């Protein structure tokens, strides 16, 4: 089972 998709990296 695949978990939730990775969240996009938000630059600081």
Curated annotation (Swiss-Prot):
GO terms for molecular function: peptidase inhibitor activity; toxin activity. It is found in: Secreted. GO terms for biological process: regulation of blood pressure. The modification Pyrrolidone carboxylic acid is found at residue 1. Expressed by the venom gland. One of its GO terms (cellular component) is extracellular region. Keywords: Hypotensive agent, Metalloenzyme inhibitor, Metalloprotease inhibitor, Protease inhibitor, Pyrrolidone carboxylic acid, Secreted, Toxin. Belongs to the bradykinin-potentiating peptide family. Bradykinin-potentiating peptides both inhibits the activity of the angiotensin-converting enzyme (ACE) and enhances the action of bradykinin by inhibiting the peptidases that inactivate it. It acts as an indirect hypotensive agent. This is Bradykinin-potentiating peptide 12b. It comes from Bothrops jararaca. The lineage of its organism: Eukaryota, Metazoa, Chordata, Craniata, Vertebrata.
């Amino acid at each position: 089972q695949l978990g939730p998709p990775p969240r996009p990296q938000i630059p600081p």
